[in-house]
Amino acid sequence: MKRAIIIGASSGIGYELAIQLAALGYQLGLMARREACLTELSHLLPGDHFVQTIDLIDADAARTQLADLIVQMGDVELIVVNSGVGASEKQLDWNIESEMIDVNVRGFTAMSMDAMNYFVQRGGGHLVGVSSVAAHFSGGLALTYHATKAFVSSYLNGMRSRAARSRLPITITTVEPGFIDTPMLETKPMWTAPVEKAVTQIVKAIINKKGHVYITKRWVVVAILFYILPNWLIRKFV
C-alpha cells in the first residue's frame, strides 16, 4: 500500500490533495492544527487513515509529531509540506510577520529537513514542498509572505541538489501555485483557479516525479515576465 503524509491537510490545497490521493489508493497521515477538521476529512475518505495535530509555530514539537506519525504508519514514501500562512500587510505588524516566519520558514525547514533525513535512511522517497509564484517577486503589501516563499523555493532547489548527490531515488518537487480558490485567498483576481483543477495538476506532477511545477501552468509566463521586466514597472502591479 502506498502511504503519504500531508502536512496542512485541513483546508484548501491539502484538503483536496487528501481527497485525490486517497482516490488513488494512498493511505494518508493527515496533519494540521485543527483536529476536528482532520477527523471529519478522514471519515470522508475511503479506507483507514491517520490523524495527527501539528502546529509549525513550535518547530521542535512539530518534529516530534512528524516522527511519531511516521512510526505509527510504518513506512511512508511521500511527504507533502503544504502548511503556510499569509496575510496582507497594510500595516507592518511584528506579531503577524513573526508568525509567518515561524511557520513558513522555521516550520517548513524543520519538516523538509526531517523528511529528507527519513528518506535517506529509508533509501528513497518523495518530498513535495508547496511554495508560491510569489517567490519570484517582492510584494509591497505582503512583503514577508513573498520573502518566506522565496526562501521555500530556494531551499527546495538546494534540497534537490542534495538529493541528486546522494544518488538515492529521492525526488524533490517544488510546487508554485498562483491564485487558487482557497480560504487563504481574500479576493478572486484574474486567473484564479478552482482548487480541484490545481490539485489535479499537482497530483500529475507527483506521479510524474517532476522537479518543479507552476500551478496552473499559465503562471510560468508570469514568472518569466517578472525576471524580464524592469523593477519600476513591476512595482506598479505589486
Q: What is each PLM-predicted segment?
A:
Residues S132:
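Residue(s) in the substrate-gating loop at a strand-loop-helix junction
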Residues T174, T187-A223:
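C-terminal helical subdomain
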